Amino acid sequence: MLWHNTIGSGPDLVLLHGWGFSSDIFETLVDKYKNQYRITLIDLPGHGRSDDVNGGINEWCNTIAELVPNNANVLGSSLGGLLAMKIASICRIKNLIVVGATPSLTCNDNWQYGMEVETFMKFADDLKQNYAKTLRRFVSLQTKDKTLMRRIFEIIDKYPPSSSALTQGLSILLETDYQELFKSLDIPKYTILGTLDM
């Protein structure tokens, strides 16, 4: 079962967090927008307070899709962005917003904007050796703000992801290429990238 919580009132906004985190990562966003939107927070499979879901991206997205209100705005961050792309293809949503996510995390012959596969595989190997240390290193790549970094570590430590969910999430990130799917979505799509995402 996936943990989810709905807060606020207004148009529906579903928030999908990234790899290794929980929906608590959105606490500042929720505080700011809960009076303008009815916000649905969902912990991804094996993350936060959610149980594991066996399988890959299709199984994860089918499970998440059951919690997405009709005509919702869906915002996904990183891995959550990739999942949001798939969910947009199986649910009726109003707008798709992806933050720090592209249709393919890794480079390939048709996509030059991702991470080199070798770099990704090194990260995956490090995860097998010491997932807590690797997750902390991953966070340190996201921000240099020490206060924010401490808060993110507190969120991760409060609800650590399962090792199987971390492995499944990395497999999804490595194997998924949604360039064609993303182009085919006939809804408004917004991509937000930071300096370190370029």
Tell me what each language-model feature is:
Residues L2-D51:
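Conserved HGGG/HGGXW glycine-rich cap/lid loop of the alpha/beta-hydrolase fold
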Residues N58-A72:
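Conserved acidic catalytic loop of the alpha/beta-hydrolase fold
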Residues G76-G80, A84:
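Gly/Ala-rich beta-loop-alpha elbow adjacent to hydrolase catalytic centers
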Residues V14-G18, S77, L193-G194:
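The conserved beta1-alpha1 loop
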